[in-house]
Amino acid sequence: MLTRMSQLFVRTLREDPADAEVPSHRWLVRAGYIRRVAPGVYSWLPLGLRVMRRIEAICREEMASIGAQEVSFPALLASDPYKETGRWVEYGDNLFRLKDRKGVDMLLGPTHEEMFTLMVKDLYSSYKDLPLCLYQIQNKYRDEARPRAGILRGREFVMMDAYSFDVAQEGLDEAYQAQRDAYIRIFNRLGFDYAIVKAMSGPMGGSRSEEFLAVAANGEDTFVRSSGGYAANVEAVRMAVPDPLPIDGLPEAEVVDTPDARTIESLVRIANEVRPRADRPWTGADTLKNVVFMVAHPDGTREPLAIGLPGDRDVDEKRLEAVLEPAVVEPFTEEDFAANPQLVKGYIGPGALGEDNSSKVRYLVDPRVVTGTSWITGADQKDRHVFNLVAGRDFTPDGVIDVAEIREGDPAPDGSGELHLARGIEIGHIFQLGKKYADALGLKVLDHNGKLVTVTMGSYGLGVSRAVAAIAEGTCDEKGLCWPREVAPYDVQVLATGKGTEILDEATRIASELAEAGLEVLLDDRKASPGVKFADSEILGMPTSVVVGRGLKDGLVEVRDRSTGENRQVSVAEAVCAVLKEVRG
């Protein structure tokens, strides 16, 4: 196919959009691939749509290879199924809700687990109908509180979601592995660096869960890897729990005056002054920091939550929110302290915490706070701390929560070496739903013994529109976009640079022959200067370009590789063959 730029609906911009936060957003707008309509809502222009369609084609090919069948559900959905599964409440403000003219609750679909489950329930009733895998590629809607980074975090986005249905766990395991293998093939074809990491299931529920992250320095997600193969989103890291220590013989707890010790640093300094240790100095790791949050639940209730962790660590609020999802974590305000006078700001200790204590504040501790560990912590009195407070002897928390920050060099939970931090953009998420939705919606089939059994499900999602941004983010440079060949809107761009009909005629001939050979070709036949055409070619980012210009008088054209920057001259007679060889290998 041959497209002429003189007829293409595109306008490149010389200035960055005012709201651009990341390179992909900047270049996709400047190159004329997308345009902002509202916060988190974008129109797709011809070039952007071509990239997205090529990604969709890859997804369809790989889904077909494992026997998945494509369907399409509406975006406008009835609320009743989401109320039955609890997600009408769980999704909270992230759900786009509306009423029809009769006052009936409706929503714009954020995901379609309920719809897939009900359709299979309506049509299938026997184990002979399974296994089954269905998928769709469709627009989704989530009312993001802070849409940002262009199409990386929008309120409308395109997603491929697939669902597997099996009679037993063994079938689900096979379906999960087939999807995982298909995702690996898809991501290998998309042409950017990615990592597969252990993940949380979130409000979807389920057990085994993995994310496919595009590695990007400014990605929203932090993940860890070890040299021994461990990989996980930090939200899913569960550190190894130390063994309990013996309590016998430990010193008794002692309340010590610690004037103005409202920070860990000042507390450690005072501890080393007033109660120096014989073996080593006190450090922040010897202190027990108790941090209080307010947790807002989807049903509108709010409760305080205290978290105890070693003082040299901070609570990672993203990890905390992942554990408590769908609840939302809020700061504990001065008004909250006033309503809970037992909590002395800066000096909170286990003595005032716990559901069995007067405050009734739920108290969860870091896994490192095991029985027999001794701590310096708040005495619930201003300017006073308790030394030698022993877990399991002097206090008992309500439970354990692993939400402390993960640091570079921390040991991997599986003992496979040190953890190394990196950042990425979540593009895919696959997990085993199990029977959560089938139970809620009554999806059962008769097994081979004639007994009704609940179907077990898997869920597999890939952000198609987000993949466009992730690829752009991972491959662009200071000049513009730089598309991998398999997703580029065009295989080749041919530029006619110079005056006179001879140059344009030769450029048109080369472009036409390449198109006849089966390539997608963009011909820059505009009446613009060579400088403008070269700049636009860099911004648009086609993997290969052919420049027909002043070298034509010597029988030469220039072939450029956008990713490597390599330029080489070839004869006019060899141009088409040279380009075909480069494109097809």
Swiss-Prot record:
One of its GO terms (biological process) is prolyl-tRNA aminoacylation. GO terms for cellular component: cytosol. Pfam families: HGTP_anticodon (PF03129), tRNA-synt_2b (PF00587), tRNA_edit (PF04073). It catalyses: tRNA(Pro) + L-proline + ATP = L-prolyl-tRNA(Pro) + AMP + diphosphate. GO terms for molecular function: aminoacyl-tRNA deacylase activity; ATP binding; proline-tRNA ligase activity. Its main location: cytoplasm. CDD domains: ProRS_anticodon_short (cd00861), ProRS_core_prok (cd00779). Gene3D superfamilies: Anticodon-binding domain (3.40.50.800), Bira Bifunctional Protein, Domain 2 (3.30.930.10), YbaK/aminoacyl-tRNA synthetase-associated domain (3.90.960.10). It is found in: Cytoplasm. It comes from the Bacteria. Keywords: Aminoacyl-tRNA synthetase, ATP-binding, Cytoplasm, Ligase, Nucleotide-binding, Protein biosynthesis. The keyword Acetylation does not apply. Its EC number is 6.1.1.15. PANTHER family: MITOCHONDRIAL RIBOSOME PROTEIN L39/PROLYL-TRNA LIGASE FAMILY MEMBER, PROLINE--TRNA LIGASE. Catalyzes the attachment of proline to tRNA(Pro) in a two-step reaction: proline is first activated by ATP to form Pro-AMP and then transferred to the acceptor end of tRNA(Pro). As ProRS can inadvertently accommodate and process non-cognate amino acids such as alanine and cysteine, to avoid such errors it has two additional distinct editing activities against alanine. One activity is designated as 'pretransfer' editing and involves the tRNA(Pro)-independent hydrolysis of activated Ala-AMP. Homodimer. Consists of three domains: the N-terminal catalytic domain, the editing domain and the C-terminal anticodon-binding domain. Belongs to the class-II aminoacyl-tRNA synthetase family. ProS type 1 subfamily. This is Proline--tRNA ligase. The gene is proS.
